[in-house]
Amino acid sequence: MQSSRSVSTEAFVRLVVDIGNTTTTLAVFTGETEPSVESVQSTLFGEPKAVAELFLSLAHRHGTPQAVAVCSVVPAAAASCSAQLESLFSVPVVTIAASLRLPFQLDYATPHTFGADRIALCAWSRHLFGDCPVIAVDIGTAITFDVLDAEGNYRGGLIMPGIDMMAGALNSRTAQLPLVDIDKPESLLGRSTIECIRNGIFWGAVRQIAGLIDAIGAELPGESKAAPAEVLVTGGNSRIIAPEIASITHLDELAVLRGIDLLLRLNS
């Protein structure tokens, strides 16, 4: 459901929780200031006592949250997290989903399967760039592309393995290839097996992402050489990948969190 409703900017404490496959990020927003952010391993949500202590510690340091939102790609963790937050702070929890009031028009064959993190990123992209076409890329456990046209209509997306998933697959599905941490190589070609894996995954991801951005832009309605699409990139591995791609116009590692907060304010 697309909305033109204005967003409240009152200076109340808002807690947003982004539960990912690997890492969970928590952010406390107050007014329009930059959020206070911290991250924990998502496995923590299997320990209710530890989760309660984490939330109470945040409240002690930043004030009791008056509005809360949970965005999760792990359904079981989302349910337990929301229940704990409601119990601890006696506030309703907004769960990010396609059924919320959205600042863009989501045309998707299976909206119930559209990732909550992708919804938040699209929402922030539309809010940030207004009437410009946007290509939003999240370089995390998976690499996702989501595309909005100049009218705020969702045009489609892409999902591919993230760089750590690629490294894990090479290790787990072969007999001799080691598990390699991926960072920026010093050269294109590797001169050891570890270097070859690292270089292949890193530069392969760079070329894939750059090529797909160009291909999407070429067929995106409303884009021209005079007014190209904005390209917003976020995600845990965005900082090492983004500098290698000239077509990326904006890098914001907090973009999903900002989108969750935006949706919280739109739906509170």
From Swiss-Prot:
Q: Please verify whether the record's keywords include NAD.
A: no
One Pfam family cited in the UniProt record for this chain: Pan_kinase
Which residues act catalytically here? D117
- What are the binding positions for ATP in this chain? D18, I19, G20, N21, T22, T23, T24, T25, T141
What is this enzyme's EC? 2.7.1.33
Known role: Catalyzes the phosphorylation of pantothenate (Pan), the first step in CoA biosynthesis.
Q: What is this protein called?
A: Type III pantothenate kinase
